[in-house]
Amino acid sequence: MKTRPVLDPKRIAPAAAEKLRSFHVEVVDEVVAAIAAHAVVVVGMAQNPHVKNVRKALNEAGVEFQYLAYGSYFSEWKKRLAIKQWSGWPTFPQVFVRGVLIGGEELTKAAIADGTLRERAERIEHAVSASGSAAVTA
């Protein structure tokens, strides 16, 4: 599979790099805080059927999750763009398990079906509770 190239940071002017780093930083901080505080986090938007489907699949699987919504197709697109730039994931939903991005609807449903979502959450949860630290292991 061919991979998409990523622009080398050396090819971004300092002023542009600063603009990228400060673009809706408060939104990214909110997502980072939720990921640190909750085992499973779904980042999405209103009216998006893929977000709705992944939330339904998690509910049906009995997986508790924190949901963060940023606008709809008609609002808050810049906030969603900041999240996409931060995570590198191009679409919504974005699902995180114990701090690890597992993907969107398709990959989340596959992880539910094959048990890897629950396994990841439980394996890491036990490692964290046994050590008493918040270190993330994959």
Name the predicted role of every residue range.
Residues 42, 93-96:
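Cytosolic beta-strand hydrophobic patch enriched in CBS
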Residues 74-81:
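Structural motif
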Residues 97-132:
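Non-catalytic, surface beta->alpha helical segment in thiol-disulfide oxidoreductase systems
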Residues 24-68:
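Local sequence-structure signature of Cys/Sec-based thiol-disulfide redox active-site neighborhoods
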Residues 1-36, 132-138:
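N-terminal leader/targeting and pre-domain segments
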Residues 83-91:
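Thiol/disulfide oxidoreductase modules built on the thioredoxin-like
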Residues 68-74:
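Short beta->alpha junction loops
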